[in-house]
Amino acid sequence: SATPFYRLFASGMHEVLGLNFHKGSLYAVQRGELTKLTDQNGDGSADHYQNIANWELEGNYHEYSYGPVFDAQDNMYLTFNVAWVGFGEAKLSKWRGWMVKVSPDGTLSPVASGLRSPAGVMMNSAGDIFYTENQGDWVGSGRITHLEKGDFAGHASSLVWSNEPGSPMTTQITDVPDNSEPMYKAAEKVKNLKLPAVWYPHTLMGISTADMIEDVNGNMGPFFKGQYFVSDQGHSKVMRMMLEKINGQYQGICFPFREGWQSGLLRLSWGNDGSMFGGMTSRGWGSTGKDLFGLQRMLWSGETPFEMAEVHAMSDGFEITFTKPVDVSTAIQSANYDINSFNYQYHHFYGSPVIENKSHAIKAILISDDHTKVRLILDEARRFYIHEIKPRGVKAVNGELLLHEVGYYTLNNVPAGMTADLSKNKMAVVAPPPAESHQHAAVPMETTAEPATKKNSKNSNKHLTTMPSDWATPDKTLVIGTVPGMKYDVTELEVKAGTKIKLTFNNLDDDMTHNLVIVEPGTADEVGLSAFSLGVKGSQMSYVPNSNKVLFHTTLLQPEASQTIYFVAPSKPGEYSIVCTYPGHHTLMRGILKVVK
């Protein structure tokens, strides 16, 4: 509409986090109730509120509830958060951490367990249910999982209810290994542990996976028809996802798509005109979109940029389909691709660093006759690992660069099939061995403390955690902490030029990972974007880029951690920027180090 307006339809609701319009009525999931709202007299307002089902609440702030999703028999599916008491806790009220089914008569029955913060739940055109998950305890990074009856999605706390009548499983908390190995290792021992269909690498593909919708009509262009769009609350953006089934199991790849929404993007819905509506909030959690709430819509412009449209797993690597024919001279060069694989730890701790990272050599490259498909034959495709695929140097035939140069493929299964016959493909090139500088051994990145900084040698003298031996004492001691919402608790610090500074950074009042980086005046955006471009390798550098704009920094600190650094204040007076360069944080988390004479 050229003149959009709001109209009150229903009131007195308790934290509605899900709506669905079905057969003439709105169904709302409140914190503790599934409510059917009907306008019986046609005046534009609900006049009949029907309690379809309700459930226990303890009163913990984290007991969010989501849905409903309808199946063909009018059953409704809901997902429940675990409570948060410093860790995810399901035992405070029944069925927390579960997906449940509500029949048309209101009967509630459990379906699947292991959920932590399942903000999005949807059923695709094939009738399969997926849910979105947020990083936290037992969840190394954001992810999307296909749920079926009896599945355990990973959060062990929910298993406290597995012995209840109606439970489709008998798995116990004590059955779940808690040894920080990758999740697929635990799945070898816990047979109903469901691996994610697609991992969303934390910070690189958002920080708070929220909702997902399927584009069955090609609303965002014909190349993306049948794919999915996923929202992220913390990074205020939409990402794109392609799924395929290998050996009966979903897997696929996620790509960046559209950033810059005005607030935290929580809900997605298609409009009648094919536009994508986004419902937004930043209540309680910060977001890169600075508004507290909002409603926006996105329309396809009618033009498709040069992108990776699809990536398919092959028996010996991956095949990339581009939206436009490639320039063969760039697509045939192995140096124009970076392929890395990595994983996350599965444990009760909050989140996970990247582990078992490996750079892959390209053995051969095959280009289709129409120049739209490029097949990469790798030294190894690692089953159960996330593969970062970056054809960053490939151009379209018209010279156009990729709008988004990275995708993250979750390889749950390697498809069977014949390996490529290079001799029969006129556009096949056997790739030469990469130069020594491009050969990387598998580098475990299990800490983000001192060892990571030592690898980042250009920055090593910018990160001193012991007082220099020639100092008798610091001239000034500074302390800066964090507050919820991706903010430092101090926005300005003042020091004299050339003074000896002891600075302690306390990451004690937020539940996110942060660092503290002091940079040249006016360069916070530049340094923040450089940190983001490091990709998966950034975690071993604490997301501090090798830049002469970086003056001093801490390493990445997990929640409840502190670090002290020592430095001499710049000799030139000015307002030096303090910024967190953890991807997605640099636009919000800032301060000023004011240097005076």
Q: How would you describe each model-predicted region?
A:
Residues 1, 491-518, 563-577, 593-595:
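Beta-strand cores of secreted/periplasmic/IMS beta-sandwich domains, seen most often
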Residues 301-328, 486, 494-497:
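Surface beta-strand/loop "capping" patches
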Residues 323-364, 389-395, 405-409, 518:
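Short, surface-exposed alpha-helix to beta-strand junction/turn motifs within ectodomains of secreted
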